[in-house]
Amino acid sequence: RVRDMLRMFRTINGQVEQIQKPENGSWLCLSDPTDVELANVSMETGVDLADLRAPLDDEERSRVDVEDDYTMIIVDIPTVEERGGRDWYETIPLSIIITQSAIITVCMQDTPVLHPFMEGTIRGFNTYMKTRFILQILYRNATMYLRYLRIIDRESDKLELKLRHSMQNREILMLLELSKTLVYFTTSLKSNEIVMEKLTTLPRIKQYPEDEDLLDDVITENKQAIEMANIYSGVLANMTDAFASIVSNNLNNVMRIFTIISITLSIPTLIFSMYGMNFQEGMLGMPLTDKPWGFAVIIGISLVVSAIVTWFLTRSRMFK
């Protein structure tokens, strides 16, 4: 592998430093780890291997598990993946495991949610302040949801402009994909909200007075993200219904045009079939059959009648 999937950090003299082995008050970050890395961390920390593997299943639900020697928190985080030249937004699990001596994060990919912590750009972040670390991760996660929701909103605006000029299947499918993403986001945010509510009442997670404002900010940001996702879902649903009505109306217009063309073309067909396309002298008394210019006159009459019928149909209420 090009980069380490197991990285260890510790706050030393107010700075986040990468270390080579677990220490008291350190942070172990596992991103798409190997079986060997998982086994090593399990032996070093005493965390059950099954719990370390749990967030590597993208169907794992958000929850809080309290074990004898550690507590595991699983939340859904947003992620973006590029496929076919465009970004696709999804949610994946992230676990935060708190032991007596360390805090462990496990995710199936190297998530940008944790990058600022590694870079030491999060204000007031210390690896040994576990409760604050959890809240800071949850706050960062909620802000990432808000950021992606704003991007999705801008993408839906661009799609709306495209759909006004071109009703292509590609744009409509992208609109449906965005709607599906918002449903996933809303479900994940609501699951995370339940986790946050449980954390506030969990005796093992110590509550410090200086972290109360941060906890309030986390809950507020998450609620705002839920509301925003619900609003955008409603807007996209209305937009999808509107464009479905436009497509249906366009189809009706096409059918109307085809019906008018079909009726118009049936008139000369009827006239010519009556004459049998034969202008022989004395043809059962049919008018103009004995005239050399009769064929041209019949064509002219057919065109005039067709034009009159077309004019009538285009103005008829029946075809509007």
Mark where each language-model region is.
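Peripheral, non-transmembrane regulatory/ligand-interaction domains of membrane transport proteins
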Residues: 1-208, 214-217, 221-228, 286-289, ...
